[in-house]
């Protein structure tokens, strides 16, 4: 993708406004999980070491615009960031009128969502943000699918708008996986409902060699193949759609395989007994919570042979260990594969962490909704803006 990269610019002495995704969970006023903060560090360090005057933007939570809420303040993030960087990172509360920052220093601007007009991509607000800087850096892939003042509007009016290293790496990895994938290409799409992932399923069914479905989504496909699903979560009104998707995959030389065995339980709880059954032996009281060992082995074989793997969603209720074997086996097969693998989505990343796979997956996306929209083939507003500015 043709965008200007921050790493190609001379930043010395420049006022550099960087939009990161520092929307992290807090517990008792402290950062509970700093994964997103750590992901942003290479970008921030590069700007500081280049002698830039760095201003950082992010949202946190969902406060009501125009009503600053102490519970959504970025102060704990500023304190945590200061520790990681080994230098002071002041929090600027009233930053829209200007920020005092020296070369090689960073200031974190208070929650962008405290400003009226942020979510609506208000032009006047975007222009005030743009007036703060010489260079605007969009580095928050996780919010690239939202056209908001701090992710889109500001970039339209800043003197220079570019992609930060984290965003550039995301686009490169996703481009490699989707635009010219090494074959065979395999995708895993898990989740509770077909309806929430319908666009992804439709797009991928035309592209991939194998589209493996998991979770509640798989139950709808199991029903579409004519098997009983008992009391399992599934969408009866989308059974015909599931059949269509299977036909589409076949017409494009691919397949959406259906499990031959499953793991069932009688209730959704951590201590319910797990029972392996053939897919045609599920009874009226059963709930399907995972793929069975035979199916897991078959799918794992596909992973090991794949040239490209896209993973979005677990294949079972992996939060309960007795229903996590399918996800674990597929995750380990992806980690062992010589193919290029990309994983994204909150539950997927949680599974990657649980089974200790992080350093063996080629790329782990920081985006949830943005990752999904990219898989759907949609244009991300922030990326479209950067492309337009690159051709100014």
UniProtKB/Swiss-Prot annotation:
InterPro entries: Phosphoglycerate_kinase, Phosphoglycerate_kinase_CS, Phosphoglycerate_kinase_N, Phosphoglycerate_kinase_sf
Location(s), subcellular: Cytoplasm
Species of the source: Alkalilimnicola ehrlichii (strain ATCC BAA-1101 / DSM 17681 / MLHE-1)
GO molecular function, one term: ATP binding
Highest taxon listed in the record's lineage: Bacteria
Family stated for the protein in its record: Belongs to the phosphoglycerate kinase family.
Functional pathway: Carbohydrate degradation; glycolysis; pyruvate from D-glyceraldehyde 3-phosphate: step 2/5
Substrates-to-products reaction catalysed: (2R)-3-phosphoglycerate + ATP = (2R)-3-phospho-glyceroyl phosphate + ADP
List of residues binding substrate: 21-23, 36, 59-62, 113, 146
Keywords, comma-separated and alphabetical: ATP-binding, Cytoplasm, Glycolysis, Kinase, Nucleotide-binding, Transferase
Database matches in HAMAP family: Phosphoglyc_kinase
Name listed for the protein in its UniProt record: Phosphoglycerate kinase
């Amino acid at each position: 993708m043709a965008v200007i990269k921050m790493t190609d610019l001379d930043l010395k002495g420049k006022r550099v406004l960087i939009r990161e995704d520092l929307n992290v969970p807090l517990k008792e006023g402290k950062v509970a999980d700093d994964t997103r903060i750590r992901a942003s560090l290479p970008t921030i360090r590069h700007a500081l070491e280049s002698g830039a005057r760095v201003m950082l933007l992010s949202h946190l939570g969902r406060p009501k615009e125009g009503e600053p809420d102490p519970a959504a303040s970025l102060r704990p993030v500023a304190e945590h960031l200061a520790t990681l960087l080994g230098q002071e990172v002041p929090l600027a509360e009233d930053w829209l009128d200007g920020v005092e920052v020296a070369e090689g220093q960073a200031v974190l601007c208070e929650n962008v969502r405290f400003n009226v007009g942020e979510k609506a991509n208000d032009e006047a607000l975007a222009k005030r943000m743009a007036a703060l800087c010489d260079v605007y850096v969009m580095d928050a892939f996780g919010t690239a699918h939202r056209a908001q003042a701090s992710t889109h509007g500001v970039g339209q009016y800043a003197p220079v708008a570019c992609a930060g290293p984290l965003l550039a790496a995301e686009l490169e990895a996703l481009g490699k996986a989707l635009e010219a994938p090494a074959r065979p290409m395999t995708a895993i799409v898990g989740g509770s409902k077909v309806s929430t992932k319908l666009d992804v399923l439709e797009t991928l069914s035309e592209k991939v060699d194998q589209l493996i479905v998991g979770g509640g989504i798989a139950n709808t496909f199991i029903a579409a193949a004519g098997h009983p699903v008992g009391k399992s979560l599934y969408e009866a009104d989308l059974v015909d759609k599931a059949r269509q998707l299977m036909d589409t995959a076949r017409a494009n030389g691919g397949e959406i395989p259906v499990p031959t065995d499953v793991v069932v339980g009688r209730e959704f709880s951590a201590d319910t007994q797990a029972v392996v059954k053939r897919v045609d032996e599920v009874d009226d009281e059963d709930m399907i919570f995972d793929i069975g060992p035979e199916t897991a082995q078959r799918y794992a074989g596909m992973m090991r042979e794949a040239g490209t793997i896209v993973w979005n969603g677990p294949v079972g209720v992996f939060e309960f260990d007795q229903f996590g074997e399918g996800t674990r086996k597929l995750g380990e097969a992806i980690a062992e594969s010589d193919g290029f693998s990309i994983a994204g989505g909150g539950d997927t990343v949680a599974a990657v962490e649980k089974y200790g796979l992080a350093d063996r997956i080629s790329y782990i996306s920081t985006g949830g909704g943005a990752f999904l929209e990219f898989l759907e083939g949609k244009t991300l507003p922030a990326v479209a803006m950067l492309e337009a500015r690159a051709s100014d």
